From Swiss-Prot:
It is found in: Cytoplasm. Belongs to the aTrm56 family. It comes from Picrophilus torridus (strain ATCC 700027 / DSM 9790 / JCM 10055 / NBRC 100828 / KAW 2/3). GO terms for molecular function: tRNA (cytidine(56)-2'-O)-methyltransferase activity. InterPro entries: Alpha/beta_knot_MTases, HD/PDEase_dom, HD_domain, HDIG_dom, tRNA_m1G_MTases_N, tRNA_mtfrase_aTrm56. S-adenosyl-L-methionine binds at L79, G104, A105, E106, K107, V108. This is tRNA (cytidine(56)-2'-O)-methyltransferase. Keywords: Cytoplasm, Methyltransferase, S-adenosyl-L-methionine, Transferase, tRNA processing. The lineage of its organism: Archaea, Methanobacteriati, Thermoplasmatota, Thermoplasmata, Thermoplasmatales. Specifically catalyzes the AdoMet-dependent 2'-O-ribose methylation of cytidine at position 56 in tRNAs. Signal peptide: none annotated. Residues 187-294 form the HD domain. One of its GO terms (biological process) is tRNA nucleoside ribose methylation. Pfam families: HD, Trm56. Its EC number is 2.1.1.206.
Length: 341
């Protein structure tokens, strides 16, 4: 674990550069940054980045740096142009478990040099502390830190030309998206009830709750265009155009019943491919939708009767199987966990 300690921070002068130090620390593999001077605005900026882009990076300001450095259990490294070349000591530093990396803003006190186990330079020429931290972390992790993936609300899609960002909207943003597509009260009431059922399932089934929440609220957005069997496909197309995360798009596309097979899709006049839910989030949203009629929660028997009355025997069996699968993972019958909603 690598902790970055930033000392000499002056909020009126260093806010931008210290923010960059924090962002580099997060992006290049450190787990946290501690800053000596209290700066709530800087803390909130970094926390917002973590919230939007993912990860578990920690930031805290207002730390008494000297006592923090002395009490740190691990290897203490002071990055300075006056230190030994990084190539000479990096293997020794790697042998430690927890590493504290000190990055100074203004002139670093001599005490920091004396407390540090290593005074390390990436070059003995004047340079930016942001660059020094990036190079140190890259040498420490041998470039593997750049392979780390993050699951956030905002996900950058690598492009050769242009730029593309996919979003995981929160609950309020989902409702705004629905209203922007002129969803009526019937749709809103229905998806809000499906959301309640889906999130109750998510309480006992390991899953990505962000995807379940967004998928549940957006699953019927296609009904703003059509109420036919192709409304799920229409909804997926709407969300694609809005750069919504592909995992949510697939939840919406595959939410009908317990899914539609490619053979059934062909008979129904849909683009021929499988629309059967695969991920646990897709299954949760699909079945939460099954258990809601308009804005009323129903049980499995009522659901099965509805399908059997329409002579949809195969679809009814798939729904029953999906109900049993999710109930098994939950450890309780889903009818039991939703009856008090």
């Amino acid at each position: 674990m690598i902790t970055v300690l930033r000392i000499g921070h002056r909020p009126f002068r260093d806010k931008r550069i210290t923010t960059h130090v924090a962002l580099v620390a997060r992006a290049f593999g450190a787990s946290s940054i501690y800053i000596d001077t209290r700066d709530d605005e800087l803390e909130n900026t970094v926390k917002k980045v973590v919230d939007n882009f993912g990860g578990s990076f920690e930031v805290k300001t207002g730390i008494e740096w000297k006592s923090f450095m002395k009490k740190f259990h691990g290897t203490k490294v002071n990055l300075t142009m006056y230190g030994e070349p990084i190539e000479k000591r990096i293997d020794e530093i790697k042998s430690g478990d927890d590493i504290l990396v000190l990055v100074g803003a203004e002139k670093v006190p001599i005490d920091a040099y004396l407390i540090a186990d290593y005074n390390i330079s990436v070059t003995n020429q004047p340079h930016s502390e942001v660059a020094a931290l990036a190079i140190f972390l890259d040498r420490y992790f041998d470039g593997k830190e750049l392979e780390k993936s993050y699951e956030g609300k905002i996900n950058v899609v690598p492009m050769n030309h242009g730029k593309l960002v996919k979003y995981i909207p929160d609950e309020d943003q989902c409702l705004m998206i629905l209203k922007s597509e002129n969803a009526d009260d019937l749709i809103i009431r229905h998806v809000e009830t499906v959301y309640k059922v889906a999130m109750r399932m998510a309480d006992c089934i390991p899953c990505d709750r962000r995807l379940v929440a967004a998928g549940a609220l957006l699953h019927d957005i296609g009904r703003t265009k059509t109420n036919n069997i192709d409304h799920a496909i229409a909804g997926a197309e709407i969300l694609k155009k809005k750069n919504i995360d592909d995992r949510i798009v697939r939840i919406v596309e595959r939410h009908t019943g317990a899914g539609i097979t490619s053979e059934e899709a062909q008979k129904l006049g849909l683009p021929v491919k499988d629309y059967v839910p695969e991920t646990i989030e897709e299954k949760i949203v699909a079945h939460a939708d099954n258990l809601v009629s308009m804005d009323r929660i129903i049980n499995l028997k009522q659901l099965m009767d509805k399908y059997e009355n329409k002579n949809l025997h195969d679809a009814a069996l798939r729904i029953k199987k999906l109900h049993e699968e999710l109930s098994s993972i939950c450890g309780r019958d889903l009818d039991d966990i939703t009856k008090d909603l």
